[in-house]
Amino acid sequence: QTGCYGVVNRIDTTGASCETAKPEKLNYCGVAASRKIAEGDLQSMDRYKTLIKKVGQKLCVDPAVIAGIISRESHAGKALKDGWGDNGNGFGLMQVDKRSHTPVGKWNGERHLTQGTEILISMIKKIQKKFPRWTKEQQLKGGISAYNAGSGNVRTYERMDIGTTHNDYANDVVARAQYYKQHGY
């Protein structure tokens, strides 16, 4: 089972901001840009597909959401140097921040993906507590936003991404996740 925290295809999204799309050499933004970036990461992502699906099933999180985060955080590993990114602060495919967590496992291994996904779940649960009237899907999107900028940054549904990297984190990740959902994740 992978739908404990909502169904990714039911989440509304505006996709990538132009600020996120531009460094990817795209002259357009939005959902189309997110999908194009996700497509560019698909070949690398597929190396980890079995592992992503295993962790998703184990923790009841949609594997497509995990893939969406991995694409955004590390381009499925392509943006990392010896498993590290973000000036040596982020570890692994899901970029676990060593300033807030003690990274475990290999940068591309099951323990790392489990840790990253557990951090995501903890954020979703914080958002569930903070916004009990939101739908499951809204809480999932809020949790994704909080994965980047913390639950304190999520104040309203419409503006949850203001304060995330490029002000589009959850919207971009959700659009990428919807792409991966169509590709067997």
Swiss-Prot record:
* Intrachain disulfide bonds: C4-C60, C18-C29
Q: What is its EC number?
A: 3.2.1.17
Which Pfam families does this entry report, sorted A to Z?
SLT
State the top-level EC class.
hydrolase
This protein's major location comes to secreted
| InterPro entries membership | Glyco_hydro_23, Lysozyme-like_dom_sf, Transglycosylase_SLT_dom_1
| GO molecular-function term, one example from the UniProt record | lysozyme activity
An example GO CC term for this entry is: extracellular region
Q: Which of UniProt's keywords are assigned here? A: Antimicrobial, Bacteriolytic enzyme, Disulfide bond, Glycosidase, Hydrolase, Pyrrolidone carboxylic acid, Secreted
Gene Ontology biological process terms in this record: defense response to Gram-positive bacterium; killing of cells of another organism; peptidoglycan catabolic process
Compartment(s): Secreted
Q: Which Gene3D superfamilies match?
A: 1.10.530.10
What's the protein called, per UniProt? Lysozyme g
Give the protein family: Belongs to the glycosyl hydrolase 23 family.
- Pyrrolidone carboxylic acid occurs at which residues? Q1
Query: According to its UniProt record, which residues of this chain constitute the active site?
Result: E73, D86
Catalysed reactions listed for this entry:
Hydrolysis of (1->4)-beta-linkages between N-acetylmuramic acid and N-acetyl-D-glucosamine residues in a peptidoglycan and between N-acetyl-D-glucosamine residues in chitodextrins
Something else the entry says is:
Shows preference for N-acetylmuramic acid residues that are substituted with a peptide moiety. It acts only as a glycanohydrolase.
Keyword Cell inner membrane on this protein?
no
